[in-house]
Amino acid sequence: MKKYTILFGAICAIILAFSLNAKADFTSTLSFSNLPPGNPGPYGTVDVSLTGQTATITFTAAAGYFFGDGSSAAVELNTDSFTEAFVSESPSNNFKAFAFDQQVDGFGSFDLAVDQKNFAVKLTSITFTVTNTGTAWASDADVLAVNANGFDAAAHVFSTSSGLTGFAAETPGEHHIPDGGATATLLGLGLAGVAGIRARFGRN
C-alpha cells in the first residue's frame, strides 16, 4: 500500500506542476531592435494573460526605454476573428487608435497595433485586451502567432540614452510555438490516472 501512496503523491505533484504551468502568463521579450549600436536590449516585455477567451496583453518597457507614436505596441494573433479594447497606459494615456494589418518597420505586418498620438508622452506600459471569436485558444501561449517575418510582437521604442527611436521585437530564432492544447491534454491524462489509482486502491 505504501508504494501506491508514494505513487499517488508523485502523480499529484506532476498534476500540480502542469496546472501551475497552465496558469502562468506567456511572456515574449523584446530583445532585438533596429536602433543604432549603443542602444542595447532588452527593450521590454510582452505579457499575455488569458481568461476564458479574452487575453489581456501588456507591453512593459525596460529601463532606459519608452514606448510611443505609431505602432507603439503590435501583435500577431493566432485567430482570424477577434475584438479589441483599450485598457490603460502609464504614466498617462496618449492612445490614438487601433490599427489593423499594420506594417512595423523592419519586422513585417501585424494583425493589431496600438497607435499613439505622438512621442509627447513616453509610455512605460500599454495594456489592451483581445477577445477571440474564432477557434478557441487553449492557453496563454496560444494567443500570439508569428507573422510572415517570424515575429509575434513588436514595439516602437525611444532610447533615453541616445534620444533615438526605433522598433524592437523578440530575437530571431526565439519564436514560440502555440501550445495547441497540449498542456490541457496532459493535465487531463494525469487526472484520469489519479482517478484510476483511487478506484483501484482507495479502499485498501
What are these regions (language model features)?
Residues 25-176:
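Mature extracellular "passenger" or substrate-interacting domains of secreted, surface-exposed proteins
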Residues 18-24:
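Sec/Tat signal peptide C-region and signal peptidase I cleavage site
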Residues 5, 54-58, 183:
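Ser/Thr-centric signal marking residues that sit
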Residues 178-198:
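A short, hydrophobic C-terminal helix/tail in secreted or cell-surface proteins
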Residues 1-8:
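Bacterial N-terminal signal peptides that target proteins for export
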Residues 7, 167, 173, 185-187:
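Serine/threonine-rich, low-complexity intrinsically disordered segments
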Residues 200-204:
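Short, charged juxtamembrane terminal tails flanking transmembrane helices
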